[in-house]
């Protein structure tokens, strides 16, 4: 009998959810940086074997929203609780288990299997790990607790095996050749946004949205026009930099990553525009694809 199901990955910001997703899928589906709130959307990555299809879903980190964009991000995370066949709740050894208790209480009430993954165990010793496990067991008594290190791939194979055991008997939900639910344009915008997260500080990376206006592929090359939206003129100046140096660096590094991602030559043009206070506008958020429904 064939098995299939939705395995949703949730947890607080910066606990390694996207790194874990990429390790489980075996492809770089989600961008991952050292900064919190890197993931903004819910992204599916699909693992297929002859007997099984696992539809993983990476989600934004759980947070208390300060503006409408963060409200949408939280809604993506909460939607992952309602359609999971198996839930992966990711934490790290240094995290306060009581953080975002409201969300945790919702996880505790779930009737599907919950696997609590304590990530980055290479940063702890045996005694402290035992204390962490005990604390989490008191908060999520029905969850199975598995220590892992997503970055070092420790425990990932064991986790995949356990997920396979928990999945329901079901035909595949997606074509067996399909790797994700997102189109190519989505990954272009995410790769460009990843470079912005890496190369800019403070509020700039969080005030940015990237859209792809043109994506034309021929036999030898992909032609891409992208727009970086910021909220204020001053941010536009910072993104472009003195004599355009900063934007050129983003463009060059994005092109390299895109060529690696698509496996062919890329011609990339990036423009910068101001869309005032887009993070607080429902209309703009909808146009940028931040509607969780």
List where the protein language model places each region:
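Active-site glycine-centered loops adjacent to acidic/histidine catalytic or metal-binding residues
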Residues: 58, 119, 149
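Conserved G1/Walker A P-loop phosphate-binding module
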Residues: 1-75, 79-81
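Canonical P-loop GTPase G-domain recognition
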Residues: 113, 122-180, 184
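Conserved glycine(s) of the Walker
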Residues: 16, 155, 246
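P-loop NTP-binding site
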Residues: 184-293
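Conserved C-terminal guanine-recognition region of P-loop GTPase G domains, centered on the G4
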Residues: 51, 75-143, 216-218
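Conserved, well-folded catalytic cores of nucleic-acid-processing
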Residues: 27, 46-50, 84-87, 94, ...
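Catalytic P-loop NTPase motifs of RecA-like helicase/translocase cores
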Residues: 39, 62-64, 96-97, 124-125, ...
């Amino acid at each position: 009998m064939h098995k299939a199901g939705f395995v949703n990955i949730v947890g607080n910001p910066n606990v390694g959810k996207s790194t874990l997703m990429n390790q489980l899928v075996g492809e770089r589906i989600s961008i991952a940086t050292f900064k919190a709130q890197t993931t903004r959307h819910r992204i599916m990555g699909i693992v297929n074997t002859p007997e099984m299809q696992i539809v993983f879903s990476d989600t934004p980190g759980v947070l208390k929203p300060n503006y409408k964009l963060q409200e949408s991000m939280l809604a993506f995370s909460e939607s992952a609780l309602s359609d999971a066949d198996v839930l992966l709740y990711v934490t790290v050894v240094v995290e306060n288990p009581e953080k975002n208790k409201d969300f945790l209480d919702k996880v505790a009430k779930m009737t599907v299997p919950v696997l609590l993954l304590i990530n980055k165990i290479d940063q702890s010793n045996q005694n402290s790990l035992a204390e962490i496990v005990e604390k989490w067991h008191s908060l999520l008594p029905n969850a199975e607790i598995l220590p892992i290190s997503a970055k070092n791939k420790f425990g990932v194979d064991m986790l995949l095996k356990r997920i396979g055991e928990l999945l329901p008997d079901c035909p595949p939900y997606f074509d067996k050749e399909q790797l994700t639910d997102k189109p190519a344009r989505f990954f272009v915008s995410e790769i460009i946004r990843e470079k912005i997260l890496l190369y800019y500080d403070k509020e700039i990376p969080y005030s940015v949205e990237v859209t792809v206006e043109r994506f034309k592929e021929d036999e030898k090359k992909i032609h891409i026009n992208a727009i970086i939206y910021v909220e204020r003129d001053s941010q536009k100046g910072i993104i472009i930099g003195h004599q355009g140096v900063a934007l050129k660096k983003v463009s060059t590094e994005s092109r390299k990553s895109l060529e690696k991602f698509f496996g062919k030559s890329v011609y990339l043009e990036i423009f910068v525009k101001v869309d005032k206070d887009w993070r607080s506008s429902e209309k703009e958020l909808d146009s940028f694809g931040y509607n969780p429904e």
